[in-house]
């Protein structure tokens, strides 16, 4: 498919020099024509402003679900199961707050992509110095590698549980998902979205079955959604809580969302873009609502199946698999758990591969053939995962899954702060710039992320046991 160039967007007249908000030559460069990320899919899905409300919703349905995949990946499973089995329903409030933060940040990401015709990576490359841009690219690649590590390991664990395959063989098999991405995207971006939505539906069905047989204490679960100060005081609880935050609010999803909303062929007028922003936010909020249900279901399952039965140390995914059927008295419970894990891993690796392509093209402006781009981004995940299993052994998989989510949490400020800075900039966004209330909420979210990260660092360096665990896992993952 020939590459398309985004239409000229209606923006304020170009102004040269540095802007008042510190963006280097932002207004001077925002009208410069650049090739879009994912050029083979750019503006390929029709969107008519004259269609009915339902047809508009359907036209924009899809990007939000690709984003939601990252909020229910195998990294979430490790943190949610560990949190549920050890602390019961207490950490449900963290799941809720994390998902609300994710909904807010993804709305800003979608607005950036639609209003400017740039994804977040392209905006960073244009408006920061080359050195800063390269730093942000490296940080983002680390985040993607950590996320992909969790996804690849999750898929490998599922294959082992279902078919008895060694973990290393499972990791190598996951490399084949590159072919799935190529085959689906070759038929159109709608096929990618349909594939992802189908897998999400299968995950939700599996957990609906598990929850039905787990018989949760619904009153205690409802109370669990109320935040408690105990979470900040308890070292282990805070460690898992920040892992949940890192597993829920994914840095690379902010880059992904700002790009894939541009697969819709909305008009270039201010009115058309405003309408597109509205439907894009509706799509992502609804999709992340499903992600909230699945994340909460995993933690509730851990609490109902294990914590209430005195099993407080079920942190390994494999242990959860072995215990589910006998504990719940349902023969299919363990099998469905593994099937959902496999679906989650495949879904996440697919979107992670797309995010890797977007980040590479956006930050470095490197245009490679689709198969080569995806082979490179897949290798970034496959190689570390193979090294981890080869040198660390299979018994450290879940601890590394949790650690990967904590690493993701540390990467968040480097994606969130540029996103807020850009969407606050009237010279870049025009009348789409954040309102005063949105700006206050955005910086509050950023401050909360920084606070939790600083608190975790303090706890890690104050506690030798946690420090040794983290350093040991890092050394193992490095081989």
What are these regions (language model features)?
Residues 39-45, 79-84, 107-132, 157, ...:
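Flexible loop linkers connecting adjacent transmembrane helices
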Residues 178, 200-229, 238-241, 245-259, ...:
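Hydrophobic alpha-helical segments and their helix-loop junctions in multi-pass secondary transporters
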Residues 137-141, 162-184, 202, 206, ...:
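Transmembrane alpha-helical segments of multi-pass small-molecule transport proteins
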Residues 195, 368-379, 400-449, 453-457, ...:
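C-terminal membrane-solvent junction of multi-pass transporters and transport-like membrane proteins
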Residues 130-133, 168-171, 286, 334, ...:
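Loop-to-transmembrane helix boundary motifs in multi-pass membrane proteins
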Residues 55, 82-107, 121-125, 132, ...:
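Extracellular loop-to-transmembrane helix junctions
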Residues 67, 94-127, 136-142, 347:
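Juxtamembrane transmembrane-helix boundary signature
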Residues 102-115, 261-269, 289-319:
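Extracellular/periplasmic helix-exit of transmembrane alpha-helices
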């Amino acid at each position: 498919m020939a590459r398309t160039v985004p239409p000229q967007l209606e923006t304020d007249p170009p102004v040269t020099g540095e802007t008042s908000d510190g963006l280097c030559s932002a207004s001077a460069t925002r009208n410069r024509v650049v090739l879009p990320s994912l050029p083979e899919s750019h503006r390929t899905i029709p969107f008519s402003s004259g269609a009915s409300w339902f047809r508009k919703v359907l036209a924009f349905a899809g990007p939000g679900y690709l984003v939601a995949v990252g909020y229910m990946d195998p990294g979430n499973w490790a943190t949610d199961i560990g949190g549920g089995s050890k602390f019961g329903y207490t950490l449900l409030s963290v799941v809720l707050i994390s998902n609300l933060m994710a909904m807010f940040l993804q709305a800003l990401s979608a607005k950036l992509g639609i209003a400017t015709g740039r994804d977040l990576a392209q905006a960073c490359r244009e408006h920061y110095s080359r050195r800063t841009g390269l730093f942000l690219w490296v940080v983002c690649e680390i985040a993607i590698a950590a996320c992909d590590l969790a996804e690849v390991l999750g898929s490998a664990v599922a294959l082992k549980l279902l078919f008895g395959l060694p973990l290393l063989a499972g990791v190598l098999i996951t490399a084949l998902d590159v072919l799935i991405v190529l085959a689906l995207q070759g038929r159109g971006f709608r096929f990618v979205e349909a594939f992802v939505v189908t897998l999400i539906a299968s995950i939700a069905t599996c957990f609906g079955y598990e929850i039905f047989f787990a018989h949760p204490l619904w009153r205690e679960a409802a109370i669990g959604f109320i935040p408690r100060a105990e979470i900040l005081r308890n070292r282990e609880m805070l460690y898992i809580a920040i892992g949940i935050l890192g597993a829920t609010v994914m840095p690379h999803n902010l880059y992904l969302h700002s790009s894939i909303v541009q697969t819709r062929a909305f008009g270039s007028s201010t009115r058309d873009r405003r309408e597109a922003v509205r439907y894009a936010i509706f799509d992502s909020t609804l999709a992340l609502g499903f992600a909230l249900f699945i994340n909460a279901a995993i933690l509730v399952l851990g609490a109902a199946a294990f914590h209430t039965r005195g099993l407080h140390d079920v942190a390994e995914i494999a242990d959860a698999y072995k215990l589910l059927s006998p504990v719940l008295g349902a023969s299919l419970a363990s099998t469905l758990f593994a099937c959902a894990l496999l679906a989650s891993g495949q879904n996440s690796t697919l979107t992670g591969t797309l995010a890797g392509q977007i980040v590479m093209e956006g930050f470095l402006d490197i245009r490679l053939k689709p198969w080569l781009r995806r082979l490179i981004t897949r290798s970034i995940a496959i190689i570390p995962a193979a090294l981890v299993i080869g040198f660390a052994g299979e018994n450290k998989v879940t601890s590394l899954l949790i650690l990967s989510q904590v690493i993701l949490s540390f990467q968040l400020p480097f994606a969130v702060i540029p996103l807020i800075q850009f969407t606050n900039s009237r010279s870049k966004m025009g009348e789409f710039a954040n309102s005063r209330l949105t700006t206050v909420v955005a910086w509050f979210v950023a401050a909360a992320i920084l606070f939790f990260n600083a608190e975790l660092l303090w706890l890690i360096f104050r506690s030798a046991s946690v420090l040794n665990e983290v350093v040991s896992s890092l050394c193992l993952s490095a081989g």
